Amino acid sequence: MPKMKTKKSMTRRVKVTATGKVMAFKSGKRHQNTGKSGDEIRGKGKGFVLAKSEWARMKLGLLAKGK
């Protein structure tokens, strides 16, 4: 049976914390920031913990990564 590949898009959007929670980050901070206020850019830098109901689906996408 072939190896299960990691969903590379998942590894860029989501990470698993040391306690096993799934953390995501807000979009819209990478480029074209000149028109945005500093508060908006700083607010997008913070990650947030996803709801528990989403964890199993997200971890399945990261399965091949060994997390």
From Swiss-Prot:
<dbReference type="GO" id="GO:0006412">
    <property type="term" value="P:translation"/>
</dbReference>
<dbReference type="GO" id="GO:0005840">
    <property type="term" value="C:ribosome"/>
</dbReference>
<dbReference type="InterPro" id="IPR001706">
    <property type="entry name" value="Ribosomal_bL35"/>
</dbReference>
<dbReference type="GO" id="GO:0003735">
    <property type="term" value="F:structural constituent of ribosome"/>
</dbReference>
<dbReference type="GO" id="GO:1990904">
    <property type="term" value="C:ribonucleoprotein complex"/>
</dbReference>
<dbReference type="Pfam" id="PF01632">
    <property type="entry name" value="Ribosomal_L35p"/>
</dbReference>
<dbReference type="InterPro" id="IPR021137">
    <property type="entry name" value="Ribosomal_bL35-like"/>
</dbReference>
<dbReference type="InterPro" id="IPR037229">
    <property type="entry name" value="Ribosomal_bL35_sf"/>
</dbReference>
<keyword id="KW-0689">Ribosomal protein</keyword>
<protein>
    <recommendedName>
        <fullName>Large ribosomal subunit protein bL35</fullName>
    </recommendedName>
</protein>
<keyword id="KW-0687">Ribonucleoprotein</keyword>
<comment type="similarity">
    <text>Belongs to the bacterial ribosomal protein bL35 family.</text>
</comment>
